[in-house]
Amino acid sequence: YWAQQRLRTAPSPDRIAEPPAAPPRSKTVPPAYEVYSAETEKAPKQPPANKAPKTRPEVAIIIDDLGYDRALAHKFIEMNTVLTISVLPDSPFLKSLVAAANQKGYEILLHLPMEPDEYPRIQPGPGALLMAMSPDELIAQLYHDLGQVPHLIGVNNHMGSRMTKDPPKLRQVFSVLKKEGLFFIDSRTTAETQCEPSARLLQVPFAESEVFIDHSTDPEFIRRQIKRLINRAKRQGYAIGIGHPHLITFQILQEALPELEKEVDLVPVSRVVKIPS
């Protein structure tokens, strides 16, 4: 339905070259990860002095890299809370996971693979946007990826530490998102990201991740990151956290739900996006 209703503006196939394919990933192999560091996280924003704070801070939690481990994904989907689900294109369980998440009322994002600094040593996987693509190739690949995901309302980047530093490529991506009425969440895989100024230029609704919950899978680390997420939200009014489909992430998040719900309002990520000023 989404593809039929929203992709009517897709470029004509007869004028678009076939995009260069990233090397195929086995349908049984989960996605690779970029290595994140504290330097990719922005300093907390200070709320305006003359603006009254919200009654309660808001936290949006995105679980991304979904589409490969069906059983583990369903553990997150079946949690009795508010999450945002982000699925990888061309993943084997995309359709069934989106259907289950939508039935639960979760918002759905495309987890858009983009070229990392380490490419080609590290592959972003099927459906990736690559720096070598021409504008027509990139737009064709992007429409292919978007059209796979029913109930889609936004996009966040998978990897992308190279491409998110490149304003011309970002303008190509954001021009499509603007046309299709989608927002963008910057996963902040590089401290040099140019996503926010590009979103401002094209007036695309935007937000960025505040905390990676589980770039280490040590249980105590994940607990500390959840506390950081809460503290960020209290300091600036809202915060976005990104987690991944690890069993330990599910277990610690489930354990932390009472504290989260006591301290903050858990909200869908669309609640905290806005056009950058």
Language-model region placement:
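Glycine-rich anion/phosphate-binding loops
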Residues: 90-96, 131-140
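Terminal interaction modules at protein C-ends
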Residues: 1-57, 226
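Active-site beta->alpha N-cap acidic-glycine motif
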Residues: 51-123
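Short, flexible loop segments at boundaries between secondary-structure elements
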Residues: 269-277
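Short, well-ordered coil/turn segments that N-cap beta-strands
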Residues: 56-59, 81-83, 104-106, 150-153, ...
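Active-site mouth loops of central-metabolism enzymes
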Residues: 58-65, 126-137, 215-220
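Catalytic domains of cell-wall/extracellular-matrix polysaccharide-remodeling enzymes
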Residues: 135-226, 244-265, 271
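Conserved, mostly hydrophobic/aromatic
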Residues: 64, 155, 240
